[in-house]
From Swiss-Prot:
It comes from Burkholderia thailandensis (strain ATCC 700388 / DSM 13276 / CCUG 48851 / CIP 106301 / E264). SUPFAM superfamilies: IHF-like DNA-binding proteins (SSF47729). Keywords: DNA recombination, DNA-binding, Transcription, Transcription regulation, Translation regulation. InterPro entries: Hist_DNA-bd (IPR000119), IHF-like_DNA-bd_dom_sf (IPR010992), IHF_beta (IPR005685). Belongs to the bacterial histone-like protein family. It comes from the Bacteria. This is Integration host factor subunit beta. Transmembrane segments: none annotated. It holds the Pfam family Bac_DNA_binding. One of its GO terms (molecular function) is DNA binding. The keyword Transcription applies. Gene3D superfamilies: IHF-like DNA-binding proteins. GO terms for biological process: DNA recombination; regulation of DNA-templated transcription; regulation of translation. The lineage of its organism: Bacteria, Pseudomonadati, Pseudomonadota, Betaproteobacteria, Burkholderiales.
């Protein structure tokens, strides 16, 4: 699901929300989450999961073009850990085939 699909789904689920307001709400929420993570905070949404940062230590890498060794600095990367309810909900679909986003044979 893309951000625009999420906005459209919110607008259709809640008729009092116009598309513009749903878009504003989604953008505002994502901006707030991005700001919190960039400040090193952890985000916990009960029943859904938590977002945090993982530290990747500095290491020696290799330039694939020249083969030369390069120092790769330490960095922090976003990490998502699904909550128990989300894991159980997804696991309930364990026997079902994965849904393809593209229709097969023009269906």
């Amino acid at each position: 699901m893309t951000k625009s699909e999420l906005v459209a789904q919110l607008a259709s689920r809640f008729p009092q929300l116009v598309l513009k307001d749903a878009d504003f709400a989604v953008k505002t929420m994502l901006d707030a989450m991005s700001d919190a993570l960039s400040k090193g905070h952890r985000i916990e949404i009960r029943g859904f999961g938590s977002f945090g940062l993982n530290r990747r230590p500095a290491r020696v890498g290799r330039n694939p073009k020249s083969g030369e060794k390069v120092q790769v600095p330490e960095k922090h990367v976003p990490h998502f850990k699904p909550g128990k309810e989300l894991r159980e909900r997804v696991d309930g679909r364990a026997g079902e085939p994965l849904k393809n986003d593209e229709p097969e044979d023009g269906q």
